[in-house]
């Protein structure tokens, strides 16, 4: 039997993550991930700046119609001396092999199963 691709997810905000100046203190922005589909999914966040950008929780499991708020934090930095162009966070998700899975497993993303992703560019308002 062929594996079905993961259904869409929704993020709030839908397009980008925004951090406002000043950047001399840690700042946190919240993103809600919503699973409007009918299957349980596993999700994981990645970023192009792992030393500056942190996510909590960085991964998890969402049942059908469930949602979770993820805190995306930006550590203090100097935008005049550090390149921030192209910074983004990416959420990847896949169907869980076990419909009753409650705990995230990295192996879901390492096999030959279908993984979808959504990029959220980071905008720094200086």
UniProtKB/Swiss-Prot annotation:
Residues 8-125 form the MSP domain. It is found in: Cell projection, Pseudopodium; Cytoplasm, Cytoskeleton. The keyword Cytoplasm applies. GO terms for cellular component: cytoplasm; cytoskeleton; pseudopodium. The keyword Cytoplasm applies. Keywords: Acetylation, Cell projection, Cytoplasm, Cytoskeleton. The modification N-acetylalanine is found at residue 2. Sperm. Central component in molecular interactions underlying sperm crawling. Forms an extensive filament system that extends from sperm villipoda, along the leading edge of the pseudopod. This is Major sperm protein 3. The gene is MSP-3.
């Amino acid at each position: 039997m062929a594996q079905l691709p993961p259904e869409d997810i929704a993020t709030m905000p839908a397009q980008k993550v925004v951090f406002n100046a000043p950047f001399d203190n840690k700042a946190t922005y919240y993103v809600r991930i919503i699973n409007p589909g009918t299957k349980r999914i596993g999700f994981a966040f990645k970023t192009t700046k792992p030393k500056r950008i942190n996510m909590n929780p960085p991964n998890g499991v969402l049942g059908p119609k469930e949602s979770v708020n993820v805190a995306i934090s930006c550590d203090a930095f100097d935008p005049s001396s550090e390149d921030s162009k192209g910074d983004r966070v990416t959420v990847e998700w896949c169907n869980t092999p076990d419909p009753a899975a409650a705990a995230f497993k990295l192996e879901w993303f390492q096999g030959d199963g279908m993984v979808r992703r959504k990029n959220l560019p980071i905008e720094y308002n200086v």
